[in-house]
Swiss-Prot record:
It catalyses: RNA(n) + a ribonucleoside 5'-triphosphate = RNA(n+1) + diphosphate. Its EC number is 2.7.7.6. InterPro entries: DNA-dir_RNA_pol_omega, Pol_omega/Rpo6/RPB6, RPB6/omega-like_sf. The keyword Transferase applies. Signal peptide: none annotated. One of its GO terms (cellular component) is cytosolic DNA-directed RNA polymerase complex. Pfam families: RNA_pol_Rpb6 (PF01192). Belongs to the RNA polymerase subunit omega family. This is DNA-directed RNA polymerase subunit omega. The gene is rpoZ.
Length: 70
């Protein structure tokens, strides 16, 4: 079972694809700098820690105004 739940995460970020992108970028930052904002993360992996940061609202993103041309 995923902790935090996908439903909880999708309340914070509107799209599954955006959620994956934000979490992956943050996980990469954590691998390089070894800094986690959450006090006692449940997960020991960087992606899990990034998802916990998103769920705790310690990590946010600003959506780009650029739209893909259709």
């Amino acid at each position: 079972m995923l902790n935090p739940s996908i439903d909880s995460l999708l309340q914070k970020i509107d799209s599954k694809y955006t959620l994956v992108t934000v979490a992956a970028k943050r996980a990469r930052e954590m691998q390089l700098a070894n800094n986690c904002v959450v006090e006692k993360p449940v997960s020991h992996k960087c992606v899990g820690k990034a998802l916990e940061e998103i769920d705790a609202e310690a990590l946010s993103y600003v959506p780009s105004e650029d739209k893909v041309a259709e």
